[in-house]
Swiss-Prot record:
Catalytic activity: pseudouridine(1915) in 23S rRNA + S-adenosyl-L-methionine = N(3)-methylpseudouridine(1915) in 23S rRNA + S-adenosyl-L-homocysteine + H(+)
MF GO annotations: rRNA (pseudouridine-N3-)-methyltransferase activity
Protein name per Swiss-Prot or TrEMBL: Ribosomal RNA large subunit methyltransferase H
Family: Belongs to the RNA methyltransferase RlmH family.
InterPro entries on file: Alpha/beta_knot_MTases, RlmH-like, tRNA_m1G_MTases_N
Length: 159
């Protein structure tokens, strides 16, 4: 299985990079995983609704350019469906069963995802009703993908 994580913004925090690299290494036994970092759109602090839409649309264009037509897209969004780790594992397992060998997870920037990206998404996933920094979500997502593969293989994992 090929898994891409398309995300806005560069990861600067060393501790997050180390955590992500550790889970990518662990995941290499199960799947090929790539993280595609795209530049965030520079914007002042106090944006109007129209300016926010413009920023999200520009970031959205960059995201969509990195999504191949044959991939199953899962957008991380607060309004998405919440799943347990077992349900995420089941989603990944079913996609593999039905011949979907490519999954792309999308993490937006600080303003979220554009309407165009949300329309392209095959499903929307929420980890919580709380808002998390998009940099931290990368680590949480990679850990949950690793956990999903462990669950699907019947291997032990921490509950």
């Amino acid at each position: 299985m090929n898994i891409n994580i398309v995300t806005i913004g560069k990861l600067k925090e060393k501790y997050l990079k180390q955590g992500i690299e550790e889970y990518k290494k662990r995941l290499s036994a199960y799947a090929k995983i790539d993280i595609i970092e795209l530049p965030d759109e520079k914007a002042p602090e106090n944006l109007s609704d129209q300016d926010m839409k413009i920023v999200k649309d520009k970031e959205g264009e960059r995201i969509l350019a990195k999504i191949s037509p044959d991939t199953h897209v899962i957008a991380l969004a607060i309004e998405g469906k919440m799943k347990t780790s077992e349900e995420l594992a089941d989603t990944i397992d079913k996609l593999a069963t039905y011949g979907k060998s490519k999954i792309t997870f999308v993490i937006g920037g600080s303003l979220g995802l554009s309407d165009a990206v949300m329309k392209r998404a095959d499903e929307k996933l929420s980890f919580s009703k709380m808002t998390f920094p998009h940099q931290l979500m990368r680590l949480i997502l990679v850990e949950q993908i690793y956990r999903a593969f462990r669950i699907n293989r019947g291997e032990p994992y921490h509950k």
